[in-house]
Amino acid sequence: MSLSSKQKATVKDFFSKMSTRSDDIGAEALSRLVAVYPQTKSYFSHWKDASPGSAPVRKHGITTMGGVYDAVGKIDDLKGGLLSLSELHAFMLRVDPVNFKLLAHCMLVCMSMIFPEEFTPQVHVAVDKFLAQLALALAEKYR
């Protein structure tokens, strides 16, 4: 399940290309998450409006995508590089780690919609593996 050096380069290249639309991808992915998996709204009960496309959902989606971009920069050591985020999600926020995989799926859908030509099968495989490793790194402190 590890990424080859070619796949790491593919991930970095693709994320570089989509940087102009990363906010849109993050906002749309989180909107899809709360729409398709409504149980995830329970993590955002403190928001006035947790409906798809609302300002808080959009803002948190952008923040989340920023974290994914940070992870791209730490692609060679995701577990070590994301340890504090793993601790935050495990001990403070108490997010069920299955939700990382659900959000990753929503991100893949959005990436493929917004960048249909760039989202080749090779990019799909590399980004999917990267997001799976990212989810695993975020779940590190749950063990």
UniProtKB/Swiss-Prot annotation:
GO molecular function: haptoglobin binding; heme binding; iron ion binding; organic acid binding; oxygen binding; oxygen carrier activity; peroxidase activity
Gene3D superfamilies reported in the protein's UniProt record: Globins
Residues the entry annotates as binding O2: H60
Domain of life assignment: Eukaryota
One Pfam family linked to the record: Globin
Tissue and organ distribution: Red blood cells.
Residues binding heme b: H89
Domain Globin stretches: 2-143
InterPro entries listed in its UniProt record: Globin, Globin-like_sf, Globin/Proto, Hemoglobin_a-typ, Hemoglobin_oxygen_transport, Hemoglobin_pi
Biological process terms in GO annotation: hydrogen peroxide catabolic process
A single Gene Ontology CC term: haptoglobin-hemoglobin complex
Residues bearing the modification N-acetylserine: S2
CDD domains cross-referenced by the UniProt entry: Hb-alpha-like
Keywords (A to Z) from UniProt: Acetylation, Heme, Iron, Metal-binding, Oxygen transport, Transport
Family classification: Belongs to the globin family.
The protein's role, per its UniProt record: Involved in oxygen transport from gills to the various peripheral tissues.
Complexes and interactors: Hb 2 is a heterotetramer of two alpha-2 and two beta-2 chains.
PANTHER family assigned: HEMOGLOBIN FAMILY MEMBER (PTHR11442), HEMOGLOBIN SUBUNIT ZETA (PTHR11442:SF41)
Protein name: Hemoglobin subunit alpha-2
Designated gene of the protein: hba2
